[in-house]
């Protein structure tokens, strides 16, 4: 039986922390669907097609990873993707309470959906898309936190008119 999992997020932008979890999930499971949420309420810097394209570009080396944009309920996306395992990252203990609530809600809405938590590697444990965007906005060097293609996209989006 093939194990299909989804790793959902906004990925605005995708960071080395996200990539670390995608690579580790790809090593653990047969097929990983990276679900990029439209998340219009978060007012993302990059639109959904841009986030999908950037994520595809930096995950090309992973043959069992598929990048898909989605909107709506995560459980509906899980059903559409034929996935019954949800991968989530936990950077800190403070993430756990929220993620625990989400896991329970998702299980209530889709009882066959299991949530697996992965912790990032130590060098990625503090990275967040929000912090990366803030540093990039102020022309700080984010190249150690994101792929160079993401650095270029951030600079183009934030500093060219």
Curated annotation (Swiss-Prot):
The record marks 18 as: Transition state stabilizer. InterPro entries: Cyt_trans-like, PPAT, Rossmann-like_a/b/a_fold. GO terms for molecular function: ATP binding; pantetheine-phosphate adenylyltransferase activity. It comes from the Bacteria. GO terms for cellular component: cytoplasm. Pathway: Cofactor biosynthesis; coenzyme A biosynthesis; CoA from (R)-pantothenate: step 4/5. Substrate binds at residues 10, 42, 74, 88. Its cofactor is Mg(2+). ATP binds at residues 10-11, 18, 89-91, 99, 124-130. Keywords: ATP-binding, Coenzyme A biosynthesis, Cytoplasm, Magnesium, Nucleotide-binding, Nucleotidyltransferase, Transferase. Disulfide bonds: none annotated. Its EC number is 2.7.7.3. It catalyses: (R)-4'-phosphopantetheine + ATP + H(+) = 3'-dephospho-CoA + diphosphate. One of its GO terms (biological process) is coenzyme A biosynthetic process. Its main location: cytoplasm. It is found in: Cytoplasm. Reversibly transfers an adenylyl group from ATP to 4'-phosphopantetheine, yielding dephospho-CoA (dPCoA) and pyrophosphate. Homohexamer. Belongs to the bacterial CoaD family. This is Phosphopantetheine adenylyltransferase.
